[in-house]
Structures are given as structure tokens and as C-alpha cells.
Amino acid sequence: MKTVELVVPCYNEEEGLAVFIRETTKVTETIEGYSFSFILVNDGSKDGTYTVMKNLAKQYSNVKYISFSRNFGKESAMYAGLKYSTADYVVVMDADLQHPPKMLIDMCKAMEEGYDCCAARRTTREGESKIRSLFSQSFYKISNKISDVQMPYGAV
């Protein structure tokens, strides 16, 4: 059975994190041949995100978490989760369900077809600040320079 870890950067996700885990688990339980787990990365949240993470890790055996002492940014949280992962495959997803969990089904099908890497790409970044877009672009450029796996800008 192949293992997949979902790296989930979290900043002030107290209200929606349990819903994310529940909804994503509904999807992952339908995908045969894969064992899914979660790596939640608390990026210095100021709300109760850390407490929710600890409770989810107690409730679900497939939930692990990392917690930063302060906010370092989404890209740092993503990187920490990727470094911590030991799975066959890793998926980075947002906790706010902007990345539909049902896409995991198609991504696993693509992997079954023999691809080493699979990415979904957001087609628009409307409503995002220019500084946020700049940090996002920088993350992908740096990742592509230091990694053997090339990720297109906006890949999730």
C-alpha cells in the first residue's frame, strides 16, 4: 500500500481545521491502495489552532503536527511539512478547503498511470495581495532551484 501525507500549513484555522480533516478523510477513505495521513503545521497562529491540532492528533491516529513559535509564513510551513514527511507521496493542501479534497482521487489515478509527480494548479490568484503573490512566486523559484522535483507556479 502506498503512503500519502497531506501537508497542511495552518494559520488561525481554529474554526475550520476539524471540518477539513473530517471532509478530507471522507474522500481519502474511498481511495483504495493508499494510506493517507496528515501533517498539520501551525504557523504561529494567534487563535486556538494549536489546541485543535493536539486534539485532532489524539482523535485520529493518522494526524501529526508541527508548531512554530511564531509566524514564519505559509512557505516556511510548507517546507517544514515536506522535510518532516516520510511518505511515498506528499500533497500540500490548504486547511480552508480551497483545494477540493476530491482532487485527491484524480491525483492518485494519475500516479497509478505511472507519473512520478502530479500537481494541480490554481488558474487565478484574484483577491490576493501583491506581497502575498511575490512570496508565493519566490517560494516556487527557490524550491525549483534546490529540489529535484520542479513545481509549476501555483501548484498544489
PLM features: residue spans?
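Short beta-strand/loop segment that forms part of the nucleotide-sugar
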Residues: 8, 32-44, 66-67
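A conserved acidic beta->alpha catalytic loop
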Residues: 42-51, 97-98
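Acceptor/aglycone-binding surface of glycosyltransferases and processive sugar-polymer synthases
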Residues: 62, 68-70, 74-84, 89, ...
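Short helix-capping segments at alpha-helix termini
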Residues: 28-34, 57-62
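Acidic helix N-cap motif at the loop->helix transition within catalytic regions
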Residues: 15-19, 47-56
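N-proximal low-complexity "stem/linker" segments adjacent to membrane-targeting elements
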Residues: 1-26, 33
